[in-house]
């Protein structure tokens, strides 16, 4: 069975490696990925995608593109004569591309569809306090993330999982599911299920605006928001007119004598860096001030001497 694989970030690499390991059953004829990205520095070489690096290491032919609608790309896919196209964290493909696969084209999505359709399912699942997540394979169709579900696998979202940790877990779970899906397609035993839109939810693209911390929320909500964006792109706020990224923060449960109730207020208490939410205090455990390296909250607290009631800026 001839396979074309399409993916770009680290999330897609385990799936690529799992397909490659099944070389006695599947023929991986082409790997498609995004173009190399320029690095900072005058003469710095461009940076290949994680999928490109892995594919070259494994000895596969790689085609780079940022334009999946071009006639050149369509010709490359058609010339590969794929039985199946596997997509993992790539671009939205036009029907002219995925229609080239004789047995179908499917996508690996990092949620339990129809929940969290969109660009950032891992982040929004944690932000919304979900206790369970998973991966889905589904056949591509014109409307994004709405195709018939082939297979799903679930895992719990643990209290200490952030977006980076959960992404690694789901990438490996997804790699197993991709191989199971390919075996089912090859055997002709695929059974699909239409998505029930009654359970639909969105996972929109992360932006500068929707990753800003709004401190006038309960501390449990704030904690989930912060871990849902860690380590990249990271939740952010401003303090003394400078941006600060916050990677980890937990509800502070010890007794505090302070009478401060204004959300966003800072308190350095017993060497800890605390910020007021709407219903209590949040201890900032890991952060990165603008222009500095990431550090522990306690380290920042030792050198930070705000006036009583100094507030982080928030809207």
UniProtKB/Swiss-Prot annotation:
Its EC number is 2.1.2.9. It catalyses: L-methionyl-tRNA(fMet) + (6R)-10-formyltetrahydrofolate = N-formyl-L-methionyl-tRNA(fMet) + (6S)-5,6,7,8-tetrahydrofolate + H(+). Keywords: Protein biosynthesis, Transferase. (6S)-5,6,7,8-tetrahydrofolate binds at residues 111-114. One of its GO terms (cellular component) is cytosol. It comes from the Bacteria. GO terms for molecular function: methionyl-tRNA formyltransferase activity. CDD domains: FMT_core_Met-tRNA-FMT_N, Met_tRNA_FMT_C. InterPro entries: Fmt (IPR005794), Formyl_trans_C (IPR005793), Formyl_transf_N (IPR002376), Formyl_transf_N_sf (IPR036477), Formyl_transferase-like_C_sf (IPR011034), Met-tRNA-FMT_C (IPR044135), Met-tRNA-FMT_N (IPR041711). SUPFAM superfamilies: FMT C-terminal domain-like, Formyltransferase. Attaches a formyl group to the free amino group of methionyl-tRNA(fMet). The formyl group appears to play a dual role in the initiator identity of N-formylmethionyl-tRNA by promoting its recognition by IF2 and preventing the misappropriation of this tRNA by the elongation apparatus. Belongs to the Fmt family. NCBIfam families: fmt. This is Methionyl-tRNA formyltransferase. It comes from Chlorobium phaeobacteroides (strain DSM 266 / SMG 266 / 2430). The gene is fmt.
